[in-house]
């Protein structure tokens, strides 16, 4: 008996059981049978509809049918009645699109279609986006089934991408190719300037060779001579026209050239003096007395027209410098009464050894034999600040250390211990600095506004950075035409917007703005590293000796003579925004290690360093960890949890990140070391208020390395200095710094690209 017939018999039996009555005999049989068959067919239609929507009931009926076959039930005796078999793979048995197979045990569903997971009967959508099939920064949209990726991000191109299933998503990634905007013309660099393609974007650089100007004023072919304001330039073809604060124009010879700007000659060693004399009268027009060795002070003790920096017998006494115990003072007899490193002719303590020749008050008498080291007319034995002039000898905390030199003037600490070299004694050093400018909150005149310079023009205890009336003249800074100089009347005879009281000298420090390195800070007027702090970064190590620093050219040149442990020479002036430049030169063919400079120095655990290694080398002391130095220029942020010592020493040597010590912010991808006896000019821009850092290096007139924009806010300002590590005979010449809080144009472009 077929399953359909069995169902028919069951339906007829059900009809009779519900009181439909017996089938009558006789002449009325045919109509009655017809009606019952019609009713039966209607009932079967209901059953079929029920089978479509209820899978469980279908399964039950299938099992019932199979049981009917097993019981051997006979066809109904009703004449003329036929039945059809019920299909095992009824509609809805399997998920749409899944193959259904009839078996002896019932219907069997095949696998779920691509993009779904389940048993074939029930399938759910797979989220292919979890496999990250799209290009970074591109949104993935999951669909049912499959996925698709949105368009490639700005700066990239590529086809649309979509697919179905995890396997496809894992093995087929969206491909977006960098657009070279410099080749396609999709950039906004001014004509005749350098366009540098970057991943997903581009950067605009200086003018191309043969052109002068910048991205703001445009690049004109040399010979056209235009100034930034568009006026014809009076400068030499190798000079740049600079627009000063007062609107006047100045001419400055380009890197690799020297002179007065109206005339420029080749400057091989980049010390600011031309190789040959120029036909102009200014000092910088004179012939360089050491053409290949930078000596920005042009010192020449024996006046033989050969500078001391390159004269094998600088003092002309017949004794070579290497053997001369007074290389800069003529002393052919080489007499040395106290047997130190210095002959009597140049020894500031002839009868007492003092190799350091330190002379705090610069009176010609070394500290080692001077009974009044600071020159305040109080003998050392009675002076509570023997190295700092303090006539009043005040000592607020009574610890025997005068307030003028006490690193905790309100707290008893006679030992003056200061492990992090920040001039705040450990006894009162909280290390709480919420604005990150290097001044702890209790000593910061603007605790919540970064102002590393701590400038306070009206000396009211409130820093200019958070004072709305810097000069305390009753006129708010926002409308004061002399913000730093009291002028309540606001006189301005020429009506140029700058008050008469500060015309030409904005900070009234008696140094005109044109030559003032910080025209808005009366405390800083000229570049000067004559007073500096020595910081030894591995004080306990015995691998090498400490650095030996020599300052020349009235504080604008520093020489380090020894193969030494890592160390710093740090100036005392702190800066907010700053431009820092100088000439770097290793004047020897001996060794191949690190030299560089620092900025943002806040303490011996917190500073930025730009350092250059000549050759790859593993540090010779593997304790506390192996450190490998790679050749090339590196920019690092130092935030050491231990401070000076072997941990920081090895972290500085290592090219890369070291946890809790050093982060590598940028490395010159050329991996090129410095060359022996070759001069390089660096230019640093630091704007701590936004974290902007950019450093460039020139070899002669050619740009050889450019970090482009680096953003980091670990140090919100600080002091400047120079750095050495295991390298002798380093010269930092023609040093210049300048206060500058103006945000460079490329900062905004970089910020938008990152966003």
UniProtKB/Swiss-Prot annotation:
UniProt note: domains: The cell attachment motif mediates the attachment to chondrocytes. It mediates the induction of both the IAP family of survival proteins and the antiapoptotic response.
Stretches assigned to coiled coil: none
Keyword annotations from UniProtKB, A to Z: Apoptosis, Calcium, Cell adhesion, Disulfide bond, EGF-like domain, Extracellular matrix, Glycoprotein, Heparin-binding, Phosphoprotein, Repeat, Secreted, Signal
Family annotation (PANTHER family): CARTILAGE OLIGOMERIC MATRIX PROTEIN, THROMBOSPONDIN
Span list, region Disordered: 295-501
Name of the gene encoding the protein in the UniProt record: Comp
Species: Rattus norvegicus
PTM annotation (Phosphoserine): residues: 394
Entry protein name: Cartilage oligomeric matrix protein
Post-translational events: Proteolytically cleaved by metalloproteases ADAMTS4 and ADAMTS1 with ADAMTS4 showing more potent activity.
Repeat (TSP type-3) residue spans along the chain: 266-298, 299-334, 335-357, 358-393, 394-416, 417-454, 455-490, 491-526
Cofactor: Ca(2+)
Domain TSP C-terminal: 530-744
């Amino acid at each position: 008996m077929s399953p359909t017939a069995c169902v028919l018999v069951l339906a007829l039996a059900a009809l009779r059981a519900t009181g439909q009555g017996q089938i009558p005999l006789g002449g009325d049989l045919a109509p009655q049978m017809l009606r019952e068959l019609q009713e039966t067919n209607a009932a079967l239609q209901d059953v079929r509809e029920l089978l479509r929507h209820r899978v469980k009931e279908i399964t039950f009926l299938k099992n019932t049918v199979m049981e009917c076959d097993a019981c051997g039930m006979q066809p109904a005796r009703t004449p003329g009645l036929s039945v059809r078999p019920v299909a095992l793979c009824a509609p809805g048995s399997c998920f749409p699109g899944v193959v259904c197979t009839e078996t002896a045990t019932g219907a069997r569903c095949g696998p779920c279609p691509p993009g779904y997971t389940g048993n074939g009967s029930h399938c759910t959508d797979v989220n292919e986006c979890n496999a990250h099939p799209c290009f970074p920064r591109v949104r993935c949209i999951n669909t049912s089934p499959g996925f698709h990726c949105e368009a490639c991000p700005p700066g990239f191109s590529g086809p649309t991408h979509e697919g179905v299933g995890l396997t496809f998503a894992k093995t087929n990634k969206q491909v977006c190719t960098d657009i070279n905007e410099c080749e396609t013309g999709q950039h906004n660099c001014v004509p005749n300037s350098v366009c540098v393609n970057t991943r997903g974007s581009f950067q605009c650089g200086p003018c191309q060779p043969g052109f002068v100007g910048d991205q703001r004023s445009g690049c004109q072919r040399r010979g056209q001579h235009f100034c930034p304001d568009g006026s014809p330039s009076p400068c030499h073809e190798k000079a740049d026209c600079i627009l000063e604060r007062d609107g006047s124009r100045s001419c400055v010879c380009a890197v690799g050239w020297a002179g007065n700007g109206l005339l420029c000659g080749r400057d091989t060693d980049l010390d600011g003096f031309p190789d040959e004399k120029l036909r102009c009268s200014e000092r910088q027009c004179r012939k360089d007395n050491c053409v290949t060795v930078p000596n920005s002070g042009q010192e020449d003790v024996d006046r033989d027209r050969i500078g001391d920096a390159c004269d094998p017998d600088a003092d002309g006494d017949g004794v070579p410098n290497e053997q001369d115990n007074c290389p800069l003072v003529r002393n052919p007899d080489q007499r040395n009464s106290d047997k130190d490193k210095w002959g009597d002719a140049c020894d500031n303590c002839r009868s007492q050894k003092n190799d350091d020749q330190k002379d705090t008050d610069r009176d010609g008498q070394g500290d080692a034999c001077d009974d009044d080291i600071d020159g305040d007319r109080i003998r050392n034995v009675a002076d509570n600040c023997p190295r700092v002039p303090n006539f009043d000898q005040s000592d607020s905390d009574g610890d025997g250390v005068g307030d003028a030199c006490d690193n905790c003037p309100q707290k008893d600490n006679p030992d003056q211990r200061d492990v992090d070299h920040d001039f705040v004694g450990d006894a009162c050093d909280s290390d709480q600095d919420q604005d990150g400018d290097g001044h702890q909150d209790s000593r910061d005149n603007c605790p919540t506004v970064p102002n590393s310079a701590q400038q306070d023009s009206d000396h009211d205890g409130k820093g200019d950075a958070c004072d709305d009336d810097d000069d305390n003249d009753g006129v708010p800074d926002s409308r004061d035409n002399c913000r730093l100089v009291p002028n309540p009347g606001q006189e301005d005879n020429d009506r140029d917007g700058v008050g008469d009281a500060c015309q030409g000298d904005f900070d009234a420090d008696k140094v005109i703005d044109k030559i003032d390195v910080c025209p808005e800070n009366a405390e800083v007027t000229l570049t000067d590293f004559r007073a500096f702090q020595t910081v030894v970064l591995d004080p306990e190590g015995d691998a090498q000796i400490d650095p030996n620093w020599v300052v020349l050219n009235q504080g604008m040149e520093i020489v380090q003579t020894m193969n030494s442990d890592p160390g710093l020479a740090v100036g005392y002036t702190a800066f907010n925004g700053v431009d820092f430049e100088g000439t770097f030169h290793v004047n020897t063919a001996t060794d191949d290690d690190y030299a560089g400079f620092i900025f943002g120095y806040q303490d011996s655990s917190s500073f930025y360093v730009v350092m250059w290694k000549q050759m790859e080398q593993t540090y010779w002391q593997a304790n506390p960890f192996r450190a490998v130095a790679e050749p090339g220029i590196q920019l690092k942020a130092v935030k050491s949890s231990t401070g000076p010592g072997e941990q920081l020493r090895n972290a500085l040597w290592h090219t890369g990140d070291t946890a809790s010590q050093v982060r590598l912010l940028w490395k010159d991808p050329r991996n090129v070391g410095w060359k022996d006896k070759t001069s390089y000019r660096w230019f640093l821009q630091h704007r701590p208020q936004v974290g902007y850092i950019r450093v460039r290096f020139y070899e002669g007139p050619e740009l050889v390395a450019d970090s482009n924009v680096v953003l980091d806010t670990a140090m919100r300002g600080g002091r400047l200095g120079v750095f050495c590590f295991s390298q002798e005979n380093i010269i930092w010449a023609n040093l210049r710094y300048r206060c500058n809080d103006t945000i460079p144009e490329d900062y905004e472009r970089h910020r938008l690209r990152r966003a």
